[in-house]
Curated annotation (Swiss-Prot):
It catalyses: ATP + H2O + cellular proteinSide 1 = ADP + phosphate + cellular proteinSide 2. Its cofactor is Zn(2+). One of its GO terms (cellular component) is cytosol. It comes from Shewanella woodyi (strain ATCC 51908 / MS32). This is Protein translocase subunit SecA. One of its GO terms (molecular function) is metal ion binding. May bind 1 zinc ion per subunit. Belongs to the SecA family. The lineage of its organism: Bacteria, Pseudomonadati, Pseudomonadota, Gammaproteobacteria, Alteromonadales.
Amino acid sequence: MFGKLLTKLFGSRNDRTLKSLGKIVTKINALEDDYEKLTDDELKSKTSDFRNRLESGETLDDVMPEAFAVVREASKRVFEMRHFDVQMLGGMVLDSNRIAEMRTGEGKTLTATLPAYLNGLTGKGVHVITVNDYLARRDAENNRPLFEFLGLSVGINVAGLGQQEKKDAYNADITYGTNNEFGFDYLRDNMAFSPAERVQRPLHYALIDEVDSILIDEARTPLIISGAAEDSSELYTKINTLIPHLIRQDKEDTEEEIGEGDYSIDEKAKQVHMTERGQEKVEVLLTERGMLAEGDSLYSAANISLLHHVNAALRAHTLFEKDVDYIVQDNEVIIVDEHTGRTMPGRRWSEGLHQAVEAKEGVHIQNENQTLASITFQNFFRQYDKLAGMTGTADTEAFEFQHIYGLDTVVIPTNRPMVRKDHADLVYLTPDEKYAAIIQDIQGCRERGQPVLVGTVSIEQSELLARLMKQEKIPHEVLNAKFHEREADIVAQAGRTGAVTIATNMAGRGTDIVLGGNWNMEIDALSNPTDEQKAKIKADWQIRHDEVVAAGGLHILGTERHESRRIDNQLRGRSGRQGDAGSSRFYLSMEDSLMRIFASDKVTGMMKRLGMEEGEAIEHPWVSRAIENAQRKVEARNFDIRKQLLEFDDVANDQRQVVYAQRNELMDAESIQDTIVNIQADVVNGLVDQYIPQQSVEELWDVPGLETRLTQEYGLKMPIQEWLDTETDLHEETLRERIVDTWVKAYQSKEEMVGESVLRQFEKAVMLQTLDGLWKEHLAAMDHLRQGIHLRGYAQKNPKQEYKRESFELFQQMLESLKHDVISVLSKVQVQAQSDVEEMEERRRQEDAKIQRDYQHAAAEALVGAEEAEALAAHTPTVREGEKVGRNDPCPCGSGRKYKQCHGKLT
C-alpha cells in the first residue's frame, strides 16, 4: 500500500530514469536545426572530430548528444527516416549497460544504430548480436549505407566464413552476427596454435537483439566444441527394443496403495523414474538378451553404463515427442526450440539422449562426442566490457537480468498509444471444444476481413489446426520448423485482408507484420520497378491497410498458454504495432500441459461447480489469475535451474579463464625457454624427493627406482648408484645438483643438434598440445564429477562446496600432469629438423578439421538433484543394522503394511 503511494508521489524508478534521460533528448533535439544546415561532407567529418575528442580524453558520454544528433540527421538523408524521441531514449539506455524493452514495431533495428555508432567511434569493435543468420545479414545490409556514410565499416559474422573473412568481419567497427558464431569463435580462438589463427579482438561492447531469447531461453545451452568418442550405436539399438515392453504406472504411489507399472513420469520436473517392478523387468530382459549376467543387478558398479543407456532410452520414449520436441528430416533427428518453434540443426542433446532418440526413430545413430572446449552464454557474454540488449518483452524477467548479468531493465514508452484489446482467456473442458471455438472465431474474423495470427506451442498442434481448417475450407498459411525457408514471405503477407497464418510459438520473430501486407517486399520482388509501379503498389496497399484497420487490425489467437508469460506477451506483441488497431485472446482447455500440471485442480473444481455443459467456456479474472500464478511457479523454477547451472559453471569458468590466459601467454611469447627451465627444475626436484627424501639417511634411498623412472619416463640413463659408489663425497644436495646438471646438458645437446629456433618452436607446440589434451580430459572429469555430485547430500555434505573443492583438486592435478608430460615429451623425443615441427602442426590441423561444433542442452535433472541433495544434507543419516528389508516386504514394526509405505518412508 505504502509502495503504491510512494510510486504515485515520486514516480516509479522507470519513470525517474526516463525523466533524467528526457533532458538529454531535449539537448539532442536542440542540435537538429544546426545539423540540417550542414553539407554531407561536413556531416561526415563529424566522425573524425568525435574520434579526435575521444583520443584527447573526452568520454563517450561527453560526445553522446552530438553523436546521436549526427546519426539522426544521417538517417534522414540516407533512409529518409527520422529517429523518434523514444528511439533516442532507447539508444541512451543501450549505451549505459542496460536493457531497453521496446514494443514490437517501435523500430529496435533503427534504435540500435545510435549506440552502435557511438561505441564504434572507439575503434575497439561493436558486436550487434541477433538470433539467426537471416536477421544478422538483413540488419547489416540494411544499416550498412548509414554507417558507411558516416565513415564506419560494417562486418557480418555468420557460419561458413573462412579465417581471413572472419578476421575482416571482426576488424570492422561494427560487426553483425549470431550469438552462436561469436561464442564458437571465442572457443576456437582459445584452441589456436598461433596468434595468426585467432580472429577475435578483445570483447568490448555487445548489443543483443532479442536479449531475452539469448540470455534467458538459451542460458541452459552451453556451446560445445567436441570430437568423436567411442561408437556405442549398437548398444543404443539393443536397449531401444526393451522400452516398448515397459508399462507406465497407472497412478502415483500412496500410503495405502502402490500404483501398478514399470515407470512413473513427473511432468512438472520432466523426469521419468523406473519403479522396482520396472527395474526387475529390465534386468530379466537384459539377461535374456545376454547383456547382463544371471543374477547381476542393473545398479551394480560394473553396470552403470548400461543403466545410463536404459535411462536415456526411457526418457527418449516417454518425455520426447516427435513433431513437438524434434522432427525427423533427411534421416536425422533435429531438435525444435521449445521457445521459438525453430529447428536447430547441429544442436544435440547431451548424456546420450540424442542417440537414444535416434535409436527410437530408427535413423542413423551418430557417435557420442567428447568435449574439447565449452562455455555457457551466461559466462561468454559476462566477459564483455559493456553489455546491453533490447527486446519487446523483458520486464517479466527484469529480476533475472539484474541478478545474473547486472543489467537493469528500462521500459521505453511507445511512440503512439497502444490500442490493442487483450481479451480474457476462454477455458474449455476438452481440446475438441477448444478447437471448435477457435475455428468459429477464425471464420468470424474472415467474414469481417480481419487477418488472424494463430499461435501454437508445437508443430503437431499447428498441423492439427491446419487439417481442421482444410476441412472447413479456410485458406491459410502454416509457419513452423518444417517450412522455415518461406518464413519471411509468409510473415510479410500475414497482415493482408482476411489472411490466416498459423505459427508455432514465435517463429517469424524479427519480421514485422504490416497491416495490409508488406509493400516494400512487393517492390523488392520486381526487377527495376518504375516510379509508377511503386506508386501503384503503395496506393493499393493503402486501400488494403485501411480495410484491415476498419476490420479491427490483426487478431492474435493463442491456442495454449506457454510456461512463460514472456512468450505469451511476445505473441500478443505481434499485434498493435505503432498504434495500430488489434486484438488478442487465448483459448485453453483443461487438458493443456500447463493447466493439467499446475492449474488443473482449482479451475476444474470451479468449472464443475458452475455446472458447465459441452461447448461452454469459462471467462473470469480468477481463472486468468490462477493461470498467471501457475506460470509464475514455472518461471521461478526455471530461474532456479539457470541459477544453479551458473553457480556450477562459475567454478569451471574460473579454471577456463586461467587456462585460456596461460595459453594466450604461451602463444604470444617468442620463446618459452625460461618456462621450460623452471618446469624442469620443479619436475626434477619433485622426482628426486620421491626416491631420495630430504634430510634422510642413505639406507632410505631408492636409487634403482629413481634410475628406472628416469629411463622409462624421461629417456635419461644416469648411473646414479655408480656415482654414489665411486664418489664418497656425494650427498643428497650434491647428488640432486648432479642429476639436474646431467639433465640440462642432455637437453642442451638436443639444441645444438637441431638449432635453437627449431627447438624453441617445438617447445611451444608440445606445451600447447599437451595443455589442450589435459584440458580435454579435465573437462570430461568435471562432467563426470558434476553428474554425481548431488549424491553427496546423502552424506550430509553440501554438493556445491564439494564440487568446488574436488574440481580444484582436479585442476591442481592437471597442472602437475602438464609439467611432467611436457618434460617427458621434450626429454624423449628426437627432433630431426624444422620439418618435424611442421609435420606436428599439420597433424594438429587435420585433427581440427574433424572437430564438430555442438550445442548441448545441460540436463536440468542433475541440477534438480543438486537442489534436493542440499535439502538432504540437513537431515541425520539412517544407519542400517542387521539384514536389509525389501521395499515391498512387511514392515518389521508389525503394522502389517509394506515397508516402503511405513517405516521405509523414513529412510
